[in-house]
Amino acid sequence: MKKINFIDIFCGAGGLSYSFKKKGHSLKLAIDIDSSSIKTLKKNFPSFKDNIINEDIVKLVKQKKYLNFKNKIDLIMGGPPCQGFSTANRQNILNDPRNELYKFFLEYVKKIKPKYVLIENVIGIRTKADDIIKNLSNIGYVADFRLIQASDYGIPQNRKRIFFFC
């Protein structure tokens, strides 16, 4: 199997990165705004700690940081903040500004031009599915999404997740 060079945006503590790394793929950059998550990720990936960045995606895109990866990355993946989309959020804050951060993820994808894109989130983000697919299509990708039951894939959780891929 070919080794995939990947970037993980909204990496959190590194669940997606861990899975890809475990399969032999190469983490090139991981970014999250939460410093506690970044500390955890650096402990789990000590040899990659220089490529694990505590950064706001909005600033990253506006300041045009890390563009040296343009056309060198196979996959950009990420799980944009889900609080406003989550059914566990009893207030279900549809106007939560974090609900729009996926747009900055897509803007970074547009700048880096990876071969593939993977977005993971709660099922509530389906309200943005048409916009996500349209934006990916506008930058040259053929995108789709699937609803997946986490426990069907060995994850000890009984919850559904949505995956956009192209």
Give the ranges of each region predicted by the language model:
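Conserved beta-strand elements of the Class I
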Residues: N5-I7
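Cofactor-binding loops of NAD(P)H-dependent oxidoreductases
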Residues: E55, L60
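Short, conserved SAM-binding/catalytic segment
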Residues: L41-N51
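Class I SAM-dependent methyltransferase "Motif I" SAM/SAH-binding loop
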Residues: F10-A13
